[in-house]
C-alpha cells in the first residue's frame, strides 16, 4: 500500500471519529509551520486547538522539554488564559508522566476562545525535543486529551500537528513513550538526551524474551505496584505453556500420496489490488512439520525470492519484510503451488494471515481452494489477522478429502453472531489502578447451550499477573476464565492481570472456523471487588457489537453481565 493510500485511510477514519471545528480548518488554511532545527528562545506557547471528542473539557498530563545539551529545561512559570480548570499548572512539568489521578492532572473547561498554555523557561536555550503525555485519568475519559495543537517559541511557530489519544487501539502494541516532537536529528544530542530521559534510563538492561519485553517496559514506567499473591496453596506449581492443539486422528483426515499441493486464493478481506500471507507450515501424519528441503514452491507472480518468505518461520511478526504480498486481481486468481520431491502424508496446513498492520491486514486471504494432486479437497475461509501480536494468530486447516464444505458454516435459523475472533476489551476497573480481573466468561452457541472452550481457543493480554518481574506461580491465570466455578469467592479460580499504562487488558476467543454465539456471560472479579472490570467493549472480527458496564462484585455476591447477542 502506498503512503497516499494510508493517508486516505487515516483521513477517512478521522472524519468518522470527529469533524474538526471551523477554527481548526481555518488554522490549517493559514501559513504552514515548518519544524525548525534547534529553535532558540525562552517563552514556549502551547495553543490547544481541539481534543479527541469530549464536549466539555480538554487536558494534558505533562510536558517534557529537553535542550541541545541533553538536559531538561528548567521552567520558571506556567500560566494559562483560562480561569476554569482542575489540577495545578505545575503538574504539567513534574516528572510524573504516568499519573492517573484526575485531581492532579491539568484539565480545563473548553471555551470559544483558544486555550493557551505559556511555559516560561529559566533561561534562553535551544530546544531539541519536546514530549507530551496526553490526558489519561481513565481510558473512558481519554477523549479529553489534546488532539490538535500549535507551538510557538518567542512568538515564532515551531510546530502544528496532532497528538495521539492516550488510549489508542491502533498504537497499543507500540512501546508507551509519549508523543515526541524532535527538533534535531543529531545523534550526539539524542545520546545526551538519553542520559537524562527517565523513560529510557529506567528500562532494564539485561536481555529478556521478546514475548515479555513490551510488558516489562511498561511496568518499569508504572508507579509502585502493590504486591498480589495467590500461590500459597501450590507454591511449587509452575506456570505451564499450553501446547498447540493435536490434530485429531481420523481415517480420512489426510492423504498418504500427496505429490502436489495447490492453493488458489480467491479473495482478500477488502484491500484493493493486494493479497498476502505472513507464513505457511505443512504438517505430516505424525503432527510434525515437513521440512522445506522436501518441496519446492512456486507462485503465480513468478517471484521465487518473495515466495521464500512464506516458509521462513518468522510468523509471529508485524514486519512486512518477513511477509508475502503480491498484486491481486479477482478475475485472475493468485496461486501457490508446492511440489514434493517424494510423496508425503499431508495432514494439515498452518496459516498465518497477512499482519503488517491493522489497515494492511485487510490484504490477508479470505477465501481459498485447496487442491491435492489436481483434485479439489477443501474450500477454506481464512481468518483475518489482527494487526498485532498479542497471541499466536495461526489458523490450522485440517485436510479432509471427503468434505469440501466444512469451513463454510451456515448461520441457521436461530439468531446469533458469527465470527473468528471474539475480543473483549477491559477498559476500566471499579477503582484499582494496578490490577484488573474476572471470575470467568461463558459463551453459548446458537442453540443456547454452554460451549466447551479449549485452552488453545483462549488468549489474554497480559496473560496474568505472572508477567510482572516480582510475581511467579500465581494461580490466577487466564485458563481460569473458561473453567468452573465462576460464581465463587475462591481466588485460585479467578483470573487477575496487570494494568499497563495506556493499554487495556484484552481477552480473545479465537476459532479456526466461523463460530456463531448467541450469548456471552461475564462474571466479575470477586476477591477484591475494586479490581473487577467496569467498562468493556466487545468486538467480533474488528466490529464493535457491544459496550457497557459490568456490575461490581461484593464480598457475598459475584457481579455478572449477560450479553444477549440475539437482541443486537
Swiss-Prot record:
Q: GO CC annotations?
A: cell projection; cytoplasm; cytoskeleton
- Consequences of knocking out this gene: No obvious phenotype. Ultrastructural analyses reveal disruption of ciliary microtubule load and organization, although various aspects of gross cilium length, function and transport are mostly normal.
The UniProt annotation puts the region (Disordered) at: 1-30
* Ranges of compositional bias, category Acidic residues: 21-30
Taxonomic superkingdom: Eukaryota
Please provide the record's keywords in A-Z order: Cell projection, Cytoplasm, Cytoskeleton
As for subcellular location, the record says:
Cytoplasm, Cytoskeleton, Cilium axoneme; Cytoplasm, Cytoskeleton, Cilium basal body
The reply on keyword Calcium is no
Q: Which residues form the signal peptide?
A: none
Q: By its UniProt entry, which Pfam families does this protein fall under? A: DUF4457
Task: Specify whether Thylakoid is a keyword of the entry.
Answer: no
- Identify this protein by name: Protein KATNIP homolog
Amino acid at each position: 500500500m502506498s503512503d497516499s493510500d494510508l493517508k486516505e485511510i487515516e483521513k477517512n477514519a478521522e472524519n468518522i471519529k470527529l469533524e474538526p471545528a471551523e477554527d481548526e480548518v481555518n488554522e490549517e488554511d493559514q501559513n504552514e509551520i515548518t519544524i525548525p532545527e534547534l529553535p532558540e528562545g525562552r517563552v514556549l506557547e502551547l495553543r490547544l486547538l481541539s481534543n479527541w471528542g469530549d464536549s466539555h473539557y480538554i487536558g494534558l498530563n505533562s510536558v517534557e522539554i529537553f535542550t541541545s545539551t541533553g538536559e531538561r529545561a528548567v521552567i520558571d512559570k506556567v500560566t494559562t488564559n483560562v480561569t476554569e480548570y482542575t489540577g495545578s499548572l505545575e503538574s504539567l512539568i513534574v516528572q510524573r508522566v504516568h499519573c492517573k489521578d484526575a485531581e492532579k492532572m491539568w484539565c480545563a473547561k473548553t471555551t470559544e476562545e483558544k486555550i493557551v498554555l505559556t511555559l516560561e523557561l529559566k533561561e534562553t536555550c535551544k530546544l531539541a525535543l519536546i514530549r507530551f503525555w496526553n490526558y489519561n485519568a481513565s481510558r473512558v475519559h481519554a477523549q479529553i486529551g489534546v488532539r490538535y495543537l500549535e507551538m510557538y517559541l518567542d512568538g515564532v511557530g515551531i510546530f502544528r500537528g496532532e497528538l495521539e489519544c492516550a488510549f489508542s487501539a491502533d498504537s497499543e502494541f507500540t512501546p508507551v513513550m509519549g508523543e515526541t516532537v524532535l527538533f534535531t536529528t543529531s545523534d550526539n544530542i539524542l545520546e545526551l538526551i538519553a542520559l537524562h530521559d527517565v523513560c529510557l534510563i529506567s528500562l532494564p538492561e539485561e536481555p529478556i524474551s521478546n514475548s515479555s519485553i513490551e510488558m516489562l517496559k511498561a511496568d518499569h514506567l508504572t508507579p509502585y505496584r502493590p504486591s498480589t499473591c495467590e500461590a500459597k496453596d501450590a507454591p511449587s506449581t509452575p506456570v505451564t505453556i499450553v501446547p498447540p492443539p493435536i490434530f485429531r486422528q481420523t481415517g480420512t483426515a489426510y492423504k498418504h500420496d500427496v505429490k502436489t499441493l495447490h492453493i488458489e486464493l480467491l479473495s482478500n478481506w477488502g484491500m484493493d489490488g493486494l493479497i498476502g500471507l505472513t507464513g505457511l507450515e505443512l504438517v505430516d501424519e505424525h503432527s510434525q512439520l515437513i521440512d522445506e528441503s522436501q518441496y519446492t514452491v512456486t507462485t503465480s507472480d513468478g517471484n521465487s525470492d518473495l515466495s521464500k518468505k512464506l516458509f521462513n518461520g518468522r510468523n509471529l511478526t508485524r514486519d512486512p519484510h518477513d511477509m508475502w504480498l503480491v498484486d491481486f486481481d479477482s478475475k485472475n486468481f493468485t496461486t501457490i503451488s508446492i511440489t514434493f520431491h517424494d510423496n508425503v502424508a499431508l495432514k494439515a496446513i498452518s496459516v498465518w494471515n497477512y499482519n503488517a498492520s491493522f489497515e494492511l491486514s485487510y490484504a490477508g486471504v479470505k477465501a481459498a481452494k485447496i487442491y491435492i494432486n489436481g483434485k479439489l479437497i477443501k474450500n477454506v475461509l481464512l481468518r483475518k489477522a489482527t494487526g498485532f501480536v498479542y497471541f499466536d494468530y495461526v489458523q490450522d486447516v485440517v485436510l479432509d478429502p471427503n468434505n469440501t464444505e466444512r469451513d463454510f458454516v451456515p448461520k441457521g435459523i436461530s439468531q446469533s453472531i458469527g465470527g473468528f475472533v471474539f475480543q473483549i476489551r477491559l477498559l476500566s476497573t471499579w477503582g484499582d489502578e494496578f490490577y484488573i480481573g474476572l471470575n470467568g466468561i461463558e459463551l453459548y452457541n446458537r442453540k443456547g447451550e454452554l460451549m466447551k472452550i479449549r485452552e488453545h481457543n483462549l488468549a489474554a493480554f497480559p496473560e496474568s499477573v505472572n508477567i510482572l518481574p516480582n510475581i511467579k506461580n500465581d494461580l490466577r491465570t487466564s485458563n481460569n476464565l473458561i473453567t468452573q466455578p465462576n460464581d465463587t469467592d475462591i481466588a485460585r479460580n479467578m483470573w487477575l492481570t496487570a494494568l499497563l499504562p495506556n493499554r487495556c487488558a484484552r481477552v480473545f476467543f479465537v476459532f479456526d472456523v466461523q463460530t456463531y454465539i448467541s450469548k456471552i456471560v461475564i462474571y466479575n472479579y470477586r476477591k477484591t471487588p475494586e479490581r473487577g472490570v467496569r467498562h468493556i467493549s466487545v468486538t467480533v472480527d474488528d466490529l464493535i457489537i457491544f459496550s457497557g458496564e459490568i456490575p461490581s462484585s461484593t464480598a457475598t455476591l459475584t457481579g455478572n453481565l449477560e450479553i444477549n447477542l440475539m437482541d443486537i
